[in-house]
Design a protein with these regions (language model features):
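A general structural signal for short secondary-structure junctions and capping/turn motifs
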Residues: 65-67, 138-141, 246-247, 310-313
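Glycine-rich ThDP/TPP pyrophosphate-binding loop and its adjacent helix/strand module
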Residues: 4, 195-396
Length: 468
C-alpha cells in the first residue's frame, strides 16, 4: 500500500517512517507511592533538613531571594524540643499554651464529630488529625479580620477565632439551628463575620477567589489581606494556576497555602507533581515569594505565615507556602485508607505529631507537664461534649428538627422568578406523594414564598419542628 503521508512528512522535513526504526518506543511515567498496604513504610526518599538551618530572608526582599529555600524547609523545633534558628518567633509561653489548647480542642472536636457520624447523627465528616498546627498557628499569625478562603480541613481556624462550637455542630447536623439551613454539605462552614469564607466542595475555587478579594482590598485602600488553603492534589487544578498568575501580575496582598499531606483521597502526591520538585518551588515560575515549611512544627508554621502576612500587608506581594505534613486519618468518613496505604505510615511519619511536639517544647521550657496535658485533654473533651449536647437539642440527621423543605428555594431572589416557583411547587407536590408521612400540619408554607415571607414563617415552623 502506498504511503500517503510521505508528501506531508517531506513538506515539514520529518524523517521517513523507516528512519525511526532504531528509536525506542515512547513510554509514559505513572507515579507510584513509596509503599502499599501490607508493606513497611519507606521514608528513605525524604530529606529533612536540620531545624534552624534555613536562612530567614527579610520580609521586604526580592522574591528571588526566597526561591532557594523552597527546596529546603523552615523548621524551628529540634530533636531536643528546643526552638532554634532565625525563624524562631520567640512567642511567650502563654501564647504557646493557648495554641496548644486550641489544637487539642480541634482534635477533640474532630473525634466527637467522627463518632457522631458513625452513630448516624450526621451523614459526613472530615477530620484534620495531624494537620492542626497549620490551621491554628496560621490563625494566630494572621490578623483577626484577615479573610480566609479555606478548604475543608481548616476547622482549626474557626475554633482559633472563637467561633461557637455549637454553631459548627448545628451545621454538621443540618438541624434547625443551622444558619445555612441545611443547604451545605456537613463541614462546609460559612462565617463572614469571623473572616471565614464559605467552603466549597469544588476543589481549588477558593484560590482565585482569595486573590480577587485581596485585589479588591487593595483597590479600596484597606489594610486587610487574604489567605487561602488547598491540598496538594488541588494544586493540579487550573484554578491554582489562574490564581498564581493574577496574584503575580497584580502583586495581590495574599498568602496562598498548599497543604501537602501526601494523599489526595487515595491519589499519591506524585500525581500532582511531587516527584518532580516541591510545590513551593512553583513560586519561582510565577516570580513570587515561596516558602516550604514543616507543617507539624507549630512555631515554623506561625513564623512562615507571619512573614508572608507582614510582606503582603507592606505591599510586598503574594507568597506561596507549602506545608509538608501527613494526613493521619482517612480522607473522610467515606474513606478507608487501609485500602491504598500502609497502616504503619502514620506511626512512622518522621515529622511526628504537631500537638505532642508543641507540648514537649513547653515541657522542655518548664512551662508545662504531662499531668497538665492530661487535664487539658479532659477539659477540651468536656467542652466539646457540652456543645454537642446543646446542639443536639436542635436535632440530628433524620430527627425531624430541620428547616422546612420549601426554604431551599428562598434567600436568593427577593421575588422568586416564575421558573423557580414552578420548580418549587413541583418539588413540594412530589415530596407529598413520595413521603406522605413527612407532611406535617398544613400551612401557608406549602407554596413558594418571597424571601421576606419565608423568613417570618420559617421561624414559626421551626419552633414546632414541622413543615414539608
Amino acid at each position: 500500500m502506498a504511503d500517503d503521508t510521505a508528501p506531508i512528512r517531506a513538506m515539514h522535513g520529518a524523517p521517513a517512517a523507516s528512519a525511526r526504526g532504531n528509536l525506542p518506543p515512547l513510554e509514559l511515567h505513572v507515579p507510584e507511592p513509596h509503599s502499599r498496604p501490607g508493606e513497611k513504610p519507606d521514608y528513605s526518599w525524604l530529606e529533612i533538613p536540620e531545624a534552624g538551618s534555613l536562612a530567614r530572608p527579610d520580609e521586604a526582599c526580592p522574591a528571588s531571594e526566597t526561591w532557594a529555600g523552597t527546596l529546603g524547609m523552615v523548621r524551628v523545633l529540634d530533636e531536643d524540643n528546643r526552638a532554634v534558628g532565625p525563624w524562631d518567633p520567640a512567642l511567650d509561653p502563654e501564647t504557646l499554651r493557648r495554641m496548644l489548647r486550641t489544637m487539642a480542642l480541634t482534635r477533640a472536636f474532630d473525634d466527637r464529630m467522627y463518632r457522631g457520624q458513625r452513630q448516624g447523627k450526621t451523614s459526613f465528616y472530615m477530620k484534620s488529625t495531624g494537620e492542626e498546627a497549620i490551621s491554628v498557628a496560621g490563625a494566630f499569625a494572621l490578623a483577626a479580620d484577615d479573610m480566609v478562603f479555606p478548604s475543608y480541613r481548616q476547622q482549626g481556624i474557626l475554633i482559633a477565632r472563637g467561633y461557637p462550637l455549637e454553631e459548627m455542630i448545628n451545621q454538621i447536623y443540618s438541624n434547625r439551628g443551622d444558619r445555612l439551613k441545611g443547604r451545605q454539605l456537613p463541614i462546609m462552614y460559612s462565617a463572614r463575620d469571623y473572616g471565614f469564607f464559605t467552603i466549597s466542595g469544588n476543589l481549588a475555587t477558593q484560590f482565585p477567589q482569595a486573590v480577587g478579594w485581596a485585589m479588591a482590598s487593595a483597590i479600596k485602600g484597606d489594610t486587610r489581606i487574604a489567605t487561602s488553603f488547598v491540598g496538594e492534589g488541588s494544586s493540579a487544578e487550573g484554578d491554582f494556576h489562574a490564581a498564581m498568575t493574577f496574584a503575580a501580575v497584580y502583586n495581590a496582598p495574599v498568602v496562598l497555602n498548599v497543604v501537602n499531606n501526601q494523599w489526595a483521597i487515595s491519589s499519591y502526591s506524585g500525581f500532582a507533581g511531587a516527584e518532580r520538585t516541591t510545590f513551593a518551588a512553583r513560586a519561582a515560575g510565577y516570580g513570587i515569594a515561596g516558602l516550604r515549611v514543616d507543617g507539624n512544627d507549630t512555631l515554623a508554621v506561625y513564623a512562615a505565615m507571619r512573614w508572608a502576612a507582614n510582606r503582603a500587608r507592606a505591599n510586598g506581594g503574594p507568597t506561596l507556602i507549602e506545608y509538608f505534613t501527613y494526613r493521619a486519618e482517612g480522607h473522610s468518613t467515606s474513606d478507608d485508607p487501609s485500602a491504598y496505604r500502609s497502616a504503619q505510615e502514620r506511626e512512622e511519619w518522621p515529622l511526628g505529631d504537631p500537638i505532642m511536639r508543641l507540648a514537649n517544647h513547653l515541657i522542655a521550657l518548664g512551662e508545662w507537664s504531662e499531668e497538665q496535658q492530661v487535664e487539658m485533654d479532659r477539659e477540651v473533651a468536656e467542652e466539646v461534649r457540652a456543645a454537642t449536647k446543646q446542639a443536639e437539642r436542635n436535632g440530628v440527621l433524620g430527627h425531624g428538627f430541620h428547616h422546612p423543605f420549601h426554604t431551599m428555594f428562598e434567600d436568593v431572589f427577593e421575588e422568586l422568578p416564575w421558573n423557580l416557583e414552578e420548580q418549587a411547587a413541583q418539588a413540594i407536590r412530589e415530596r407529598e406523594i413520595k413521603w406522605p408521612e413527612r407532611v406535617g400540619q398544613k400551612h401557608s408554607g406549602d407554596k413558594p414564598r418571597t424571601s421576606a415571607q419565608g423568613s417570618a414563617e420559617s421561624a414559626s415552623e421551626d419552633s414546632r419542628g414541622e413543615g414539608l
